[in-house]
Structures are given as structure tokens and as C-alpha cells.
Amino acid sequence: VSLIKKDIALRYGASVLSLKKEDILFHEGDTANFFYQVEDGAIKMVTYSLDGKEFIQGLFYQGDCFGEPPLFCDFKYPGSAVTLIESKILRIPKDRFFDLLKENFDVHLQLDRILCERLRYKNMILSEISFYDPEHRILSLLGYLKSKAPVSDQPFQVPLTRQQLADMSGMRVETVIRTIKRMEESGKLQIQDHKIFF
């Protein structure tokens, strides 16, 4: 379910961007001038270390909004937004987005809930990295990713590489590979054609 219905967004000056896989919507350090919502497709928010290592801050699917905090606090984007697949992104200019929030309290309240949920996720990741063994970290991360994906009666296909799972969970890729193999052997997940299903 989208935070902002498309007809309402269009009344506030929204446009829809069509992007290809691996297109960059905005870069870390850019000024935030728009509210963004996924109409179709998937986005990852990432930061990069000095040696080029990618850390995935979040994944966003159809109906999800992303990149809002800099709109409210006037700081630069702390990460880059990159498409995982071909995507359509709804975008509303910052000033019109604030008008929309002022005139639609239900949207404002729902956005508050979304931001609180993201804080909860960040807290979970910090706890996982600090206190738990690799299998627990991976199970928690896969459970979270599955909860964010569209509901399906099929096993959830993890849209990340083992390197990306390592980057999100604070582990080395070798540890993730060994742990996933053990989890497959114990029936906690499946691997088909090198893809992870949970």
C-alpha cells in the first residue's frame, strides 16, 4: 500500500520517472529537493566506504517511500538511491510535498509511523551486529527483508548477493557463505541456481 495515492500526488505536482536497472536516482551528498515513492520496481539505498565497499542501508519496493529525512532537516543525502530492477518512481517537489503533509494529516501520521519503523530496523541491525552469532543475524535480516516484500505463497527469493548480505549484517562474505550453506543443510532456507529462497 502506497503512502500517497497517485491521484493525490499528481494534484501536488508529482511526476513519474522511468528508470533502468542500476540507474542512480540521487547520490550521497546531493541536496534533497524531492519526495520519492516506488510506483513499480525496487530501490536500494547505499553508502560506500573509501575503498568502494557498498553498505546497503535499506531496500524499498512498490508503495514504499525513501530518502525523506534530508527533506525535514536540510542535510545532504547520507546515501545514494540505486534501482535494483527497472523501476517507476513517483516524485513530488519538496515544497509541494510539505503542502501535501499540511493538508493531509493522515498521510503525515502514516509517514511518522514509517520513519519510526525504520528507526526500529536500524536498532535491530545494531543489536544483531553487536550481540548475535552469524546464523541469527542472517535469519533476522532475511525475516526483515521478507516482511518488506510483496506477500506471496511462494518462497521469498532474496534479492541480494551474499556480498550484499554481508555488507548489511556487518560480516565478512566468507562467513555469510559458510553460514548460508549450514542453514541450507539444516533446512532453514533453500538455494536454487545460486539464489537464496527463504
Q: How would you label these PLM feature ranges?
A:
Residues L141-L145:
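Short amphipathic alpha-helical elements of helix-turn-helix/winged-helix folds
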Residues S2-K21:
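Short proline/glycine- and basic residue-enriched helix-capping loop/turn segments at helix->loop/beta transitions
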Residues K146-F198:
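Phosphate-/nucleic-acid-contacting segments
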Residues D23-I85:
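Cyclic nucleotide-binding regulatory domains
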Residues L19, V38, F198:
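Conserved catalytic Walker-motif region of ABC-type ATPase nucleotide-binding domains
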Residues F98-L101, Y121-F131, A149-S152:
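Short helix-to-loop capping/linker segments positioned immediately adjacent to catalytic or ligand/cofactor-binding
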Residues D7, Y12, Q57-C116, R120:
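Cyclic-nucleotide recognition modules
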